Amino acid sequence: MKAVIFLVSELDYDRWTVESDNEKRFDLMSDEEVMELQNSGHIEFGGHTLTHVSFFDVDDERAREEIEKDKEITEKRLGKKLKVFAYPYGHKRKEVVEMVKECGYSFAVSTDTGSGIFTKDLFDIRRTAIDKTSLINFLRRISPRYLQYKARKYKDKF
């Protein structure tokens, strides 16, 4: 089993965190680092848009560009086809899910929403984001109660 890292193709730092949370800038992986990880055989890479946009904040034309161009750039960078896509911030809408399918992805993951059962909906698989955090918060996020809380919290949003 491989770990999956989702690449944002047109940024070289975590702009979304710096701008929204006033966090310190964190450089994203260089091409050399990406290739080293790919060549290790332990890492799979996935698409994650050009600029880490929220699909709630852009129209369909911009969403399609973010998905399609990111896939094209990242596949060229890696020299292989991408199988998996991650919706930035977990934000998705029906039209975006269809775009991801049309781009040829095999499945897509969200954050906080979607099924925890892999075979239920291949384009709405839930994953839990584990950011830089404490051990207590890590344990909280992997507990079943946390997943139930998140499912209730976002039930009507998506």
Where do the protein language model's features map onto the residues?
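Residue-level signal for pocket-adjacent positions within structured domains
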Residues: 24, 50, 120
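Histidine/lysine/aspartate-rich catalytic loop segments that bind and position anionic ligands
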Residues: 29-66
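C-terminal active-site subregion of NodB/CE4 polysaccharide deacetylases
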Residues: 40, 57-158
